[in-house]
């Protein structure tokens, strides 16, 4: 389970503000956010890297492309499915949507959000679970309190993405998985176990895109039981 919240052209200083928590088994090898080149891709990607699958869960480019994904829980995971993480990496390709349509049965179920940072249209969704609603309310409150000033991405992450409050069991959705496991996953920040394997929030990220094209990528990631901070800034390259 991952969770995201964003605001598009709703702040006087930012075109986009995005929050994202990635939840994964702690044993899965992962690199923190950095610039890296994926095989066969033209642009470098800024984002973390899943060393097992080779992809990412949240990535952006200097050319203004941004993509992230969240998983959809399935009672029986697909055997031999390709990694979802390759999708944000491939999102900028020509004819990519046709390739995805042809390969959709080979990839585990997920929700993929794509942004072209110089466009004016934003994605939307209608089915919101309790922790998403909770994060949305907290995010709106944070923005209302900082509507005339530059936003601290670190403060935004620490105040909003570390919330461990779980949903009331009466509103936990029925997704077909074990209800007790569903309950464990009902907070914004997750820290639990599945059998003997520790599972939970591995990284918390915030991206701020200012109106002048300055992009800041803030990440707080967990490695060897320690939380590490990482900040990358760059100027978005405008299309000629």
Predicted regions and their residues:
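N-terminal nucleophile
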Residues: 1-240
């Amino acid at each position: 389970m991952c969770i995201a919240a964003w605001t598009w052209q709703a702040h006087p200083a930012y075109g986009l503000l995005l929050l994202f928590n990635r939840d994964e088994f702690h044993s899965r090898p992962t690199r923190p956010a950095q610039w890296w080149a994926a095989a066969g891709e033209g642009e470098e990607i800024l984002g973390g890297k899943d060393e097992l699958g080779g992809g990412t869960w949240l990535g952006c480019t200097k050319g203004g492309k941004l993509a992230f994904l969240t998983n959809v829980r399935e009672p029986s995971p697909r055997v031999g499915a390709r990694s979802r993480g390759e999708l944000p990496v491939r999102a900028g390709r020509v004819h990519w949507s046709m390739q995805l349509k042809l390969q959709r049965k080979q990839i585990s179920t997920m929700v993929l959000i794509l942004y072209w940072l110089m466009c004016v249209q934003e994605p939307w969704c209608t089915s919101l679970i309790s922790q998403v609603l909770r994060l949305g309310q907290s995010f709106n409150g944070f923005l209302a309190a900082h509507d005339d000033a530059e936003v601290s991405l670190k403060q935004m992450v620490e105040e909003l993405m570390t919330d461990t409050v779980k949903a009331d069991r009466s509103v936990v959705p029925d997704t077909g998985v074990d209800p007790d496991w569903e309950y464990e996953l009902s907070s914004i920040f997750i820290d639990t176990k599945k059998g003997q394997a520790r599972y939970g929030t591995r990284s918390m990220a915030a991206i701020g895109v200012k109106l002048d094209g300055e992009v800041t990528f803030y990440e707080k990631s967990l490695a060897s039981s320690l939380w590490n901070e990482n900040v990358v800034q760059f100027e978005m390259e405008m299309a000629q």
